[in-house]
Curated annotation (Swiss-Prot):
Disulfide bonds listed in the record: none
Pfam families recorded: Trp_syntA
PANTHER family tied to this protein: TRYPTOPHAN SYNTHASE ALPHA CHAIN, CHLOROPLASTIC, TRYPTOPHAN SYNTHASE, ALPHA CHAIN
Function: The alpha subunit is responsible for the aldol cleavage of indoleglycerol phosphate to indole and glyceraldehyde 3-phosphate.
Organism listed in the record: Jannaschia sp. (strain CCS1)
Residue ranges the record marks as coiled coil: none
Protein name: Tryptophan synthase alpha chain
Active-site feature positions: E49 (proton acceptor), D60 (proton acceptor)
Reaction catalysed by this enzyme: (1S,2R)-1-C-(indol-3-yl)glycerol 3-phosphate + L-serine = D-glyceraldehyde 3-phosphate + L-tryptophan + H2O
Length: 263
């Protein structure tokens, strides 16, 4: 059982949905990013997705791309991202952390070394958006052997023929991308999401978390209500980009988590 598994078990026992938030490590700078990260659990965040800055983030919309570029411009690296996790873990040993990014920085470091460092830093799971199931031997299988969850993405174009491959080695939760396209797109509609989540859940016991396009407390409540929870990224990152005080960013996150937890 990982921290992710424990979190879903606890939420399920209390009849609550999960609220997952995404921030980019090192955006707009290390200290501010860490301050936001440290405040997320008190703002109601159940699981933290921490973005690993990368030079070619092909699956991300402009909001996340710019956040990654700001982080890179500020000198953020994989080593510093792992250090941020260690700094967070010094005060929080319970909130799950999922590192989300692309395979190149991991490959460059070496898979075995990366997995050892990630586990020791306190990372619980990985989302690597450019590694399909056909390449599970690259990272997915070794990651799970190292005790990390490997979280896969599914989209509206993941049909019944493709779904078993997507689910085959997924653990922790499945991230359902509610809209085809890049991050930060238009708001998802519960009427569209509900049957897709039901279709996925008929094939797996893994929790299904829905993301992309959620910007309000009401949207968080509505979407979490037809899944096991929801994830918000671009809406939070946008506020960080605008230079909002950390307290205001966290107040916004609290409004979103309140919505999800009211589902």
């Amino acid at each position: 059982m990982t921290r992710i598994d424990d979190t879903f078990a606890r939420l399920s026992a209390s009849g609550k949905k999960a609220f997952v938030s995404y921030i980019m490590a090192g955006d707009p700078d290390y200290a501010t990013s860490l301050e936001v990260m440290r405040g997320l659990p008190a703002a109601g965040v159940d699981i933290i997705e921490l973005g690993l800055p990368f030079t070619d983030p092909m699956a991300d919309g402009s909001t996340i791309q710019l956040a990654g570029q700001r982080a890179l411009d500020g000198g953020m690296t994989l080593d510093k991202t792992l250090q941020m996790v260690r700094d967070f873990r010094a005060g929080d040993d319970t909130t799950p952390i999922v590192l989300m990014g692309y395979y190149n920085p991991i490959y460059s470091r070496g898979v075995d070394r990366f997995l050892t460092d990630a586990r020791e830093a306190g990372i619980d799971g990985l989302i690597v958006v450019d590694l399909p199931p056909e390449e599970d031997e690259e990272l997915c299988i070794p990651a799970q052997a190292a005790g990390l969850n490997f979280i896969r993405l599914a989209t509206p174009t993941t049909d019944d023929a493709r779904l078993p491959a997507v689910l085959s080695n997924t653990s922790g939760f499945l991230y359902y991308v509610s809209i085809t396209g890049i991050t930060g797109a238009a708001a998802p509609q519960a009427a569209d999401v509900a049957p897709e989540v039901a279709r996925i859940k008929s094939a797996t016991d893994i929790p299904v978390i829905v993301g992309f396009g959620i910007t309000t407390s009401e949207a968080a409540r509505t979407i979490a209500g037809v899944a096991d929870g929801c994830v918000v990224g671009s809406a939070i990152v946008s506020r960080i980009a605008e230079g909002e005080p950390v307290a205001d960013v966290l107040a916004f996150v609290k409004s979103l988590s309140d919505g999800a937890h009211a589902a």
